[in-house]
From Swiss-Prot:
HAMAP family according to UniProt: NrdR (MF_00440)
Cofactor field: Zn(2+)
Native source organism of the sequence: Staphylococcus saprophyticus subsp. saprophyticus (strain ATCC 15305 / DSM 20229 / NCIMB 8711 / NCTC 7292 / S-41)
Pfam families for the chain: ATP-cone, Zn_ribbon_NrdR
Lineage: superkingdom: Bacteria
Gene expressing this chain: nrdR
Domain called ATP-cone: residue spans: 49-139
Annotated function: Negatively regulates transcription of bacterial ribonucleotide reductase nrd genes and operons by binding to NrdR-boxes.
Taxonomic placement: Bacteria, Bacillati, Bacillota, Bacilli, Bacillales
Protein name stated in the entry: Transcriptional repressor NrdR
Family: Belongs to the NrdR family.
Length: 156
């Protein structure tokens, strides 16, 4: 590991512990040359996931895109950032557990919406309105009626 100050490759681990992230280890290191302390994170190497978009193009899966979309849909809503990270983590785990190399953007959106609906329904409608590309208010109302029907079933 290179020291961020002097670029020396000689450092020693001062402290190791599990990070807040899943499957990560936080290591506190000290450079043996300049004695600068710095932190590194060790993660399990993940096989790349390829997302097949609606137009057929392919790109590498980026969890940040899910998180950014969730943050936008939850603006000014009583949703904690940690909840959005949990949704993002759950979606990524589910996709990786399926063991496929390629996944459609439609499937990713469905996973996100299923989890978001249980966190905040207004944020769900915001996310769905962008994801599903509603053409008019009638389509949006149909989606909202589906939520209301789901609420009635779960309340019974």
């Amino acid at each position: 590991m290179k020291c961020p100050k002097c670029n020396s490759t000689h450092s020693r681990v001062v402290d190791s512990r599990h990070a807040d992230e899943v499957n990560a280890i936080r290591r506190r290191r000290e450079c043996e040359e300049c004695e600068t302390r710095f932190t590194t994170f060790e993660h399990i190497e993940k096989r790349p996931l390829i997302v097949v978009k609606k137009d057929g193009t392919r790109e590498q899966f980026l969890r940040e895109k899910i998180l950014n979309g969730l943050v936008r849909s939850c603006e000014k809503r009583p949703v904690r950032y940690e909840q959005l990270e949990d949704i993002t983590n759950n979606v990524e785990w589910k996709l990786r557990d399926e063991g496929r190399a390629e996944i459609s953007s439609r499937e990713i959106g469905e996973h996100v919406m299923n989890l978001l609906m249980h966190v905040d329904q207004v944020s769900y409608v915001r996310f769905a309105s962008v994801y599903k590309e509603f053409k008019d208010v009638d389509q949006l109302l149909q989606s909202m009626q589906g939520i209301l029907a789901e609420n009635k079933r779960s309340d019974s």
